[in-house]
């Protein structure tokens, strides 16, 4: 039997699937199928299902139903939307952004402009590029935009693009499935976009993204879809991107060191952050 909430998550009619093998409508990943085949319990497995060709991303628990010591006659399965799990995790972990636009102190015309642009960005839906020297408060503005936006209840995931070695960059950003490469964690790893699902992904020092990966990230941002390394399922990712840089990206584009398409995807809204030395009335 298929309970109402599970049917809603999977997009299936409970009456239509009664008496039929569930695999006729639902395709599951290999490790989940292996657990079912061998009658093993599953605890908090992140699952990528295909339900009549539609991807469903959820957390699944399976409890075998046995009579005596025999092979299980079935399973009790509980499913939860992965976005719900992420929201609970970030609430418990204290990962909600706490900065507000009122934390942008100062009375200068420049800081008032930044505050107005940040308010407009918070109301909008486009990706945001924050430009300015190191130390001008780009991280504060990014958090404040997130917290003033309709995504405030979602996670705020901050990533320093300079922190990852080149050979690990894609696996860190796109995530990977179990066994995707030598040394990969057995349980796999979600992409940064999945971690930010329903919220904001803040890409600090975006100029440090290796050029050969620009087209991949640009495509994820454009389509709102990601496929983990070694994976076969496309995962929808509803994420807003805020990027920051202390570099003239237009100059990098002209030099061939930054892809124009990625810059276009990142900069629906551009906010220039002035250094304190240019706004003496705020000192």
Where are these regions (language model features)?
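N-terminal capping loop/helix in small sensory signaling domains highlighted by a polar->aromatic N-x2-3-F motif
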Residues: 1-7, 11
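Terminal output helix/cap of sensory domains in signal transduction proteins
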Residues: 10, 14-59
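Sensor-regulatory modules in signal-transduction proteins
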Residues: 49, 65-67, 276
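Sensory coupling linkers of modular signal transduction proteins
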Residues: 64-106
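AAA+ ATPase active-site-proximal loops
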Residues: 96-236, 240-252, 275-276
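Conserved Sensor-2/SRH helix of P-loop NTPases
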Residues: 283
């Amino acid at each position: 039997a298929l309970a109402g909430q599970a049917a809603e998550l999977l997009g299936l009619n409970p009456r239509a699937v009664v008496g039929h093998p569930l695999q006729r409508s639902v395709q599951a990943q290999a490790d989940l199928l292996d657990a079912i085949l061998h009658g093993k319990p599953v605890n908090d497995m992140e699952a990528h299902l295909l339900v009549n060709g539609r991807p469903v991303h959820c957390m699944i628990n399976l409890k075998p139903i046995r009579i005596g010591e025999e092979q299980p006659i079935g399973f009790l399965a509980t499913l939860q939307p992965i976005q719900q799990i992420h929201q609970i995790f970030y609430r418990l972990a204290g990962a909600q952004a706490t900065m507000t636009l009122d934390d942008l102190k100062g009375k200068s015309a420049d800081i008032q402009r930044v505050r107005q642009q940040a308010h407009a960005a918070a109301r909008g839906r486009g990706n945001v590029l924050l430009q300015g020297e190191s130390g001008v408060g780009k991280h504060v503005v990014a958090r404040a935009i997130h917290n003033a936006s309709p995504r405030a209840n979602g996670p705020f995931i901050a990533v320093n693009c300079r922190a990852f070695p080149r050979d690990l960059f894609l696996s860190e950003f796109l995530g990977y499935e179990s066994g995707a490469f030598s040394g990969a964690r057995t349980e796999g790893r979600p992409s940064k976009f999945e971690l930010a699902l329903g919220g904001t992904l803040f890409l600090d020092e975006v100029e440090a993204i290796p050029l050969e990966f620009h087209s991949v990230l640009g495509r994820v941002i454009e389509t709102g879809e990601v496929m983990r390394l070694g994976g076969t399922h496309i995962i929808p990712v509803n994420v807003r991107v805020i990027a920051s840089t202390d570099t003239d990206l237009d100059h990098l584009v002209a030099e061939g060191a930054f892809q124009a398409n990625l810059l276009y995807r990142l900069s629906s809204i551009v906010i220039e952050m002035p250094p304190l030395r240019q706004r003496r009335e705020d000192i």
